[in-house]
Amino acid sequence: MKIHKTSSETALPNQKENQMNQIRLHVWGDYACFTRPEMKVERVSYDVITPSAARGILAAVHWKPAIRWVIDRIYVLKPIRFESVRRNELGGKISAGKVSGAMKRKSVADLYTLIEDDRQQRAATVLKDVAYVIEAHAVLTAKAGADETVTKHIEMFKRRAKKGQCFQQPCLGVREFPADFALIDEGEPLPPSALSESEANRDLGWMLHDIDFDHGNTPHFFRAEMKDGVIDVPPFYAEEVKA
């Protein structure tokens, strides 16, 4: 397994600086589905939110090309409960060839999918009644301007989160499962955990960490362990993160 280092994270982060620029976001919802990639036919969720899904939630609140969100820690607040449901999905998607043809014709007249003709009902094993606290920091990317600072973006995120603002509705894995969110201010206690001692400590197995977009969209995985309801997420370039 190869380990790649992304251009947005080219050096070890400064721990003290990360703590100063750290945010904590409480997210929750009725249902969630963080799909396991090894399940090809039916959707089956991981036991908890993945770092990539957590990053997507933060980016939905605030993101610019100048920054990348790095997930440090995930707090699991509610017991892991699964439910089997049936979801309507499309059997396919519009092909790249059709999109290219529409661009050349400068017309989208034929660029559509008839949902009623392509709808399929599929079983899914999803999570029910979930709540997490996402602890993260931001790093500057190669696209950051000379006047860009991490602190500026952290403050922008905090202002937007306090007001409930977002670029798009955050979701818990899939769009059908929206996420509610609330900023946890510095010094403010975390929401209470409903986990029992046995539920709070478990090996969650190999889990998707994130996608390496700089090296062929390669998925990277890490061995997730929950201790006292907390999952420490290793840095993307750490030795224990495998491609």
Predicted feature residues:
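Polybasic, lysine-rich low-complexity intrinsically disordered segments
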Residues: 2-6
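Beta-strand elements of well-folded, non-transmembrane domains
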Residues: 27-31, 78, 134-142
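N-terminal, Lys/Arg- and Ser/Thr-rich interaction peptides
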Residues: 17-41, 225-227
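Short, Lys/Arg-enriched N-terminal segments with co-localized hydrophobic residues
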Residues: 9-19
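A short, structural micro-pattern
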Residues: 19, 68, 126-130
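Residue-level signal for secondary-structure boundary sites
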Residues: 33-35, 82, 142-144
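Glycine/small-residue-rich interface belts in oligomeric ring/scaffold proteins
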Residues: 39, 44-89
